[in-house]
Swiss-Prot record:
Residues 877-895 have a biased composition (Polar residues). Keywords: Acetylation, Coiled coil, Cytoplasm, Cytoskeleton, Phosphoprotein. Its main location: cytoplasm. It comes from Homo sapiens (Human). The modification Phosphoserine is found at residues 5, 22. Residues 1-14 have a biased composition (Pro residues). The gene is CNTLN. This is Centlein.
Length: 1405
């Protein structure tokens, strides 16, 4: 069969960019992943069928999936690169996959059709030949010409294929050179980018240094503010001392007024009892109303919660139905694909059956032809035996004839002597000599023939044998004639003595004796010479036949080897083509990634990615060695053919030289025999001339042989140089591959550097945010300083208000004198005073209000009403301000009014209460966080802040007694002036604000410390993993080096024939370990506890400065990290410069090699010119030989007539033999192909079934994992919603309780105010003026209760709105969470399909 080129591939799909896959929403991504992996399995099966020579499952570069027939992931072609897992195209839909599948099937069908057409053409050709041969008188020449033309077409097709392959190789070399240039440009671009990045880093460092300078300036400003605060506190102490002296003077006045008040209290006691009874009744009614409203609100909240739960569950059910429908569609699609695969396999089975039937038919035809061939071969063998017997008989006859010829020659010499005597006698008798006739036979001018073919040599052999027989018959006839002539000559000599007549010499007997004797002698010598020449020719022709047969054998061997190589190349080409198709379908990578060598530790696992990658690497090396081996075999075959041709040419030249010598000797002999009468000088001159010619010819032959030797040596040298250049080219290719690998590593390193730079920029931005937060803390400290300045202003105003309040505070002196001892008690004594002392109720209520406020602020600081978020530093400043406003307003709510103008001032206090409520609500929503989010963050961060809260509680407990001691001393004046109480409350508020700010700073610092610790642990873990990988890679490198040594030994054994060896060394670069410095966090010990509040403030400021120093130390550590990374970047730059130097050196080497190539080409040109000159000389010699050959052609024509029949039969025999051999080869090829197709189909079916089963199992596992993750996520969401709802309810209950307490406190205040004498007098005067009873007047004054009821209603409505808002937020979050959960589930499923080992990490995330 003629060698056929494989079908041209369809145009590849456009290459898509690689990168991290964007997961689709829903379960579409899972389906797509399953489909893409199914196509990958099919491609792997095709690869196994195509490349049977090396059945190694090749892994994808950097792929996470397993390879091999039992692996879960598909095996891809070795051309697939990758860096990085088994990646698939994402955007391919089901229809596109089906279209690609149909295209592949159409290509396979077209290739099968072409093969069938070629088989049919071969079959028809054989049948036509058979029909022509079956005719009675077949035209064998036509048959032979048809076969020769067919073989010529096949050889031409093979040569075209070889040329196409060479062109493809040249194109690939050009592509590689272009890629080298592109990669160099990319390196230059990367260097420019690095320079730009370095400039940006330097700019950022400058900015950082400027920020540090600013920070130092601000720290100095804080120190200055501390000093100012200390000075102001000393001034405040002096002012307080002056006020205490004034209070002592006022206390003496108060004692006088208290005596008057005791008289009036007895009258008021009776009135109070009546009022208390009425107030108790009103309270009971109000409590009942409040409880009823609460029950209604609770029922409404439950109803809303249940409705929300119903809506959520309905949406979840709808989503689950949608998921079920999607899963059903996917199952249907998979079933359809399975059915299509089954139909395809059935069609292929039918095709295989048809091929088997065709093979059976061809086998029958070949058997019939073999029978015919055996019959013909038997007949030919019989003919050959008969001819051999005849040849042996002729040889024996020739020996006998030679003996008879020698005897005849002796007789001829004797007769010539007798004839000479007779001639002398005749001359004497006649008186004048007759000239001897000179006969020149033109038939003996022989010429050196051109190179005869095998058939012409065989015909020569047969013709010369027939000539020998013919000459033997002539010799017999000549012997008979000689005997007759001798008898006639004797009788004639007797008669000539008796007679003396002059005219008798013209009689016929005398004529015969004179004319026939030289002719007969000449013919005898001619016949002897012809015999010798024929024997020599036979020997030469036998030698030429042997050489030609050797040539043919070597040519046949070379052609068979070339055919085998072509078949190998065809199979490899098909395999590569299928791999290219798979690569184009699987992943259109623009960058061809080279397979990295695996670590030795990774090779310990039997079925790992590293093992498959290593196998792929060795497979490539094996393929390269096979290609080299094939090239060397081709060169060996060509050299063998050239040697055989040279041998045949030398033999022919020797034969021509021998024939020339014989002809010259023969001619000289003829001249000697014919010209006996001429002088001997001419003969000697002729001999000398012939000898000179012979010597000249011998010298020419020797020079020609020397030149041929020199040319052979030059050819050998050129071959060696070509081999050396080939080895250099291979080394350069390997160097380019290593360079490409190194460039890829450099690019990866630059990408890592860019990632590190981005991480550093993120860290710098975080540090900038921290710096801004510190700036805001400084601003808050400035605000505290301003508040301290503002504290002085109300103290000055208090001096002015003290003179006005002297008359009003006269009644308070007696009370303050009685209850001085009670104000010095601790908190426990305050509680005991509440239970035991009913008389001192007013004073205890005052102290209790202060205590409640302190508890409220402590609860606020404990429960985390301050903002906990680290990133939003703006919100921290806002929360600190809102906290201050809330605390001030709540303190205004609780503060009692002692003046007589309390009724007028009640309205603004109520307004402040409403404002405080609104501010509380706004505070809850300031940061953009809902209370749900806030409490979620709080619960997430509780364990990290437990230690801090304990410390803060301890410090608050230590600070409480100091505050109580100060309040003991101050409460004496607090009963005299309300302004002092307000100042104290403002002081408390400012201190609590500072506490909250410092707590926030501490929390943020601890969070940053924990984050840095976690980052450090992760980096250490990564370092350990990288060390393990490095050790495994070393071990694998050692093993692979040993394997490489073995392979190199085999290669050297192959290259011993051509005396060229090449050694390949592979070095593995060690990855530089990047050490990250650990972040050291120095814990600062708390300073001493101060006795006074001012010292506590200093302590807190010191803590703030300590935290600032901590952060500055963190900044320094980050600086050190930056420096380390800069050093790493410098090292990378140095590596790049080294690589560039290596590249330049290798370029110089390539240029030197190119120069050497040019020199060699010039020397080749000179040799070619020499060869042309020699060819011209040979042509001249051949022309001379052709001139001499004309004389031989006449004899050949006589011989050809006798030899034609024999040559025709022999040609028929040889042609039939060759045809049978070709048919045998075709049969073997067809049988091998059929077996290959059967095995391939079986392997495809097994692999497809296994892979479909594995895909089904994987899909089931992935679906189960995704369902489990979804269930867990839904449970967590439900728990979170229940937690948030419970929290909201508890908050509402707490708010209601606080409101009740506020109302009770207000009522107590009113009752207390009613007990005062001034108010009693005012009420009596008002009743007397208006002519109204006291009870009517109290009813008129009780209008405030209705206002309070309305406020409670408004508060209840606000609470309802808040609950609804929380429920809406929960609903919105559930809706937003559901698609996210779906996306996460899809991503997890996709990762489980690709990397089953990473499923646990994905579910945890």
């Amino acid at each position: 069969m003629a060698a056929r080129s494989p079908p041209s591939p369809h145009p590849s799909p456009p290459a898509r960019q690689l990168g991290p896959r964007s997961p689709r929403v829903g379960r579409g991504a899972e389906v797509h992943a399953m489909r893409s992996e199914a196509s990958g399995f099919a491609g792997a099966a095709r690869e196994v069928v195509a490349d049977e020579s090396d059945k190694i499952w090749v892994g994808e570069e950097g792929s996470g999936g397993r390879r091999g027939p039992g692996g879960a992931a598909p095996a891809h072609a070795p051309l697939l690169s990758a860096p990085m897992g088994s990646r698939r195209l994402e955007g391919i839909s089901v229809e596109e996959a089906m279209v690609t599948r149909t295209q592949l099937l159409e290509e396979e069908l077209s290739s099968l059709k072409e093969e069938l057409a070629l088989c049919q053409a071969d079959k028809e050709f054989v049948w036509s030949l058979w029909k022509r041969l079956q005719v009675t008188n077949p035209d064998l020449t036509q048959v032979v010409s048809l076969v020769v033309e067919r073989e010529k077409q096949k050889s031409e097709a093979k040569d075209r294929k070889v040329l196409e392959i060479l062109q493809v190789k040249d194109a690939k070399i050009q592509e590689f050179e272009q890629r080298e240039s592109v990669l160099k440009q990319e390196i230059n671009d990367l260097v420019k980018r690095k320079i730009a990045v370095d400039e940006e880093n330097a700019f950022l460092r400058k900015e950082f240094s400027d920020l540090e300078k600013k920070f130092k300036d601000k720290s100095q400003e804080i120190k200055d503010t501390k000093e100012c605060v200390q000075n102001k506190e000393e001034q405040n102490r002096l002012v307080i001392k002056n006020l205490e002296e004034e209070n002592k003077k006022l206390s003496t006045r108060c004692t006088d007024l208290l005596n008057d008040l005791e008289k009036l209290r007895k009258q008021e006691a009776h009135l109070r009892k009546e009022k208390y009874s009425t107030d108790a009744k009103i309270k009971t009614f109000e409590d009942n109303l409040i409880e009823a409203r609460k029950e209604v609100e609770v029922s409404q909240s439950k109803y809303n919660a249940l409705s929300l739960q119903l809506s959520n569950k309905q949406t979840e059910l709808i989503q689950k139905d949608m998921d079920i429908t999607l899963v059903r569609k996917e199952l249907q699609e998979l079933q359809n694909l399975y059915k299509q695969n089954s139909t395809h396999t059935a069609q292929q089975a039918e095709l295989i059956q048809q091929l088997q039937v065709l093979n059976m038919d061809t086998q029958k035809v070949l058997r019939n032809q073999e029978d015919v061939h055996t019959a013909e071969s038997i007949s030919y063998q019989k003919l050959y035996n008969e001819l051999h017997i005849c040849f042996e008989t002729t040889k024996s006859n020739e020996a006998m004839l030679r003996q008879s010829v020698t005897n005849l020659q002796d007789q001829l010499l004797q007769k010539e002597q007798e004839n000479a005597k007779l001639k002398e006698k005749l001359q004497e008798s006649q008186g004048a000599p007759l000239p001897l006739p000179q006969e020149s036979d033109p038939d003996y001018s022989a010429q050196v023939p051109h190179r005869p073919s095998l058939s012409s040599l065989e015909t020569l052999m047969v013709s010369q044998k027939s000539e020998i027989e013919y000459l033997q018959e002539k010799l017999k006839i000549a012997n008979e004639k000689l005997s007759e002539n001798i008898s006639a000559n004797k009788g004639f000599s007797r008669k000539s003595i008796m007679t003396s007549a002059e005219g008798k010499h013209k009689e016929p007997p005398v004529k015969r004796s004179r004319s026939l004797s030289p002719k007969s002698s000449f013919t005898d010598s001619e016949e002897l010479q012809k015999l010798r020449k024929a024997e020599r020719k036979i020997e030469n022709l036998e030698k030429a036949l042997q050489l030609k047969s050797q040539e043919n054998d070597e040519l046949r061997d070379a052609h068979e080897k070339r055919k085998e190589r072509l078949q190998m190349l065809q199979t490899n080409y098909r395999a590569v083509k299928e791999q290219l198709k798979q690569w184009e379908e699987g992943s259109g990578m623009t960058e061809i990634r080279k397979i990295k060598r695996a670590d030795p530790q990774q090779l310990r696992q039997e079925d790992s990615d590293a093992v498959w990658n290593e196998l792929a690497y060795f497979k490539r090396e094996n393929q390269e060695l096979m290609i080299q081996k094939m090239n060397l075999e081709e060169e060996l075959d060509e050299l063998k053919v050239h040697i055989s041709i040279d041998k045949a040419a030398i033999q022919e030249l020797n034969r021509c030289v021998a024939e020339r010598r014989e002809e010259q000797l023969f001619r000289s002999g003829e001249d000697d025999e014919v010209k006996r009468s001429t002088p001997e000088k001419n003969g000697k001159e002729m001999l000398e001339q012939t000898l000179q010619k012979v010597t000249e010819l011998e010298n020419r032959l020797k020079s020609f042989e020397k030149r041929s030797r020199k040319l052979k040596e030059g050819n050998k040298k050129l071959m060696k140089e070509n081999d050396f250049l080939k080895s250099l080219l291979k080394q350069q290719q390997e160097d380019t591959e290593t360079r490409e690998k190194e460039l890829e590593q450099i690019i990866k390193g630059s990408k890592d550097v860019e990632k590190e730079n981005t991480e550093l920029q993120v860290k710098i931005s975080e540090l900038e945010t921290e710096v801004t937060s510190l700036r805001r803390q400084v601003a808050e400290a400035n605000a505290l300083r301003n508040e301290n300045e503002e504290l002085i202003n109300p103290m000055e105003k208090s001096h002015q208000s003290a003179d006005r309040a002297k008359s009003e505070m006269a009644t308070m002196k007696v009370r303050s004198g009685r209850y001085d001892c009670k104000t010095t008690m601790t908190k426990v004594k305050f509680k005991a005073a509440k239970k035991n002392c009913s008389v001192g109720r007013h004073h205890t209520v005052l102290n209790h209000s202060i205590k409640v406020m302190s508890n409220v602020f402590e609860n606020l600081s404990k429960d985390g009403w301050e903002d906990v978020s680290e990133s939003s530093s703006d919100s921290e400043a806002q929360t600190s301000q809102t906290l201050g406003t809330i605390i001030v307003e709540t303190s205004q709510k609780i503060s009692p009014t002692e003046d007589g103008k309390d009724q007028k001032e009640s309205d603004p206090t109520e307004d402040s209460q409403t404002q405080g409520k609104e501010i509380v609500q706004t505070y809850l929503n300031i940061d953009g966080k809902t209370p749900k989010d806030y409490f979620h963050d709080k619960n997430a961060k509780k364990p990290t802040f437990q230690k801090k809260n304990c410390k803060m509680q301890k410090s608050s407990h230590t600070a409480v007694p100091t505050r109580v001691n100060r309040e003991k001393y101050k409460n004496i004046t607090a009963q005299k002036s309300s302004s002092n109480i307000i100042l104290l409350r403002e002081r408390i508020i400012s201190l609590q604000q500072q506490n909250s700010v410092l707590q926030n700073a501490k929390k943020t610092a601890e969070l940053s410390v924990k984050e840095y610790k976690e980052v450090n642990e992760k980096l250490l873990h990564q370092q350990q993993v990288s060390d393990q990988r490095f050790q495994t890679s070393r071990q694998t490198i050692k093993k692979l080096n040993l394997d490489l040594a073995g392979l190199r030994k085999e290669k050297e054994d192959l290259l011993k024939k051509l005396e060229s060896s090449s050694e390949i060394t592979s070095l593995a670069e060690e990855n530089s370990q990047v050490t990250f410095p650990r972040i050291q966090v120095t814990s600062l010990s708390p300073s001493r506890s101060m006795d006074l509040e001012m010292k506590q403030l200093q302590y807190k400021l010191k803590n703030a400065t300590n935290e600032l120093t901590k952060q500055s130390s963190n900044v320094k550590t980050l600086k050190f990290e930056l420096l380390a990374k800069e050093e790493h970047i410098k090292e990378m730059h140095e590596k790049i410069s080294r690589m560039e130097r290596d590249i330049t050196m290798k370029r110089h080497l390539i240029e030197d090699l190119k120069f050497r190539q040019k020199v060699n080409l010039e020397s080749n040109k000179s040799f070619s010119e020499m060869l042309q000159n020699l060819d011209k000389k040979v042509k001249t010699l051949t022309e001379e030989c052709s001139n001499k050959k004309v004389s031989i052609d006449s004899l050949k024509q006589r011989l050809n007539v006798a030899v034609k029949e024999k040559s025709q039969y022999e040609q028929m025999y040889q042609k039939s033999k060759e045809e049978l051999e070709k048919k045998d080869l075709k049969l073997t090829l067809l049988v091998s192909r059929i077996s290959e197709t059967e095995s391939a189909m079986a392997e495809i079916e097994t692999a497809a079934s296994k892979q479909l089963q594995e895909l089904a199992l994987q899909s089931e596992q992935v679906l189960e994992g995704a369902q489990k993750t979804l269930l867990l996520a839904n449970e967590k969401v439900e728990e979170f919603t229940t937690f948030v709802k419970a929290l909201a309810k508890e908050l509402q209950n707490d708010v209601h309780v606080v409101r009740r307490q506020i109302r009770e406190l207000k009522k107590m205040k009113k009752n207390r105010d009613a007990c005062k004498t001034s108010t009693h007098k005012a009420q009596t005067l008002a009743a007397s003026i208006l002519n109204i009873s006291r009870s009517d007047l109290e009813e008129i004054l009780d209008t405030e209760d209705q206002v309070e009821i309305e406020k409670t209603k408004i508060d209840a409505e606000n609470d309802k709105e808040w609950m609804l808002y929380i429920q809406k937020l929960l609903e919105g979050q559930s809706l937003t969470l559901s698609p996210r959960l779906k996306c996460n589930g899809a991503i997890v499923a996709h990762q489980n399909l690709r990397l089953p080992d990473s499923s646990s990490s994905a579910s945890a995330s």
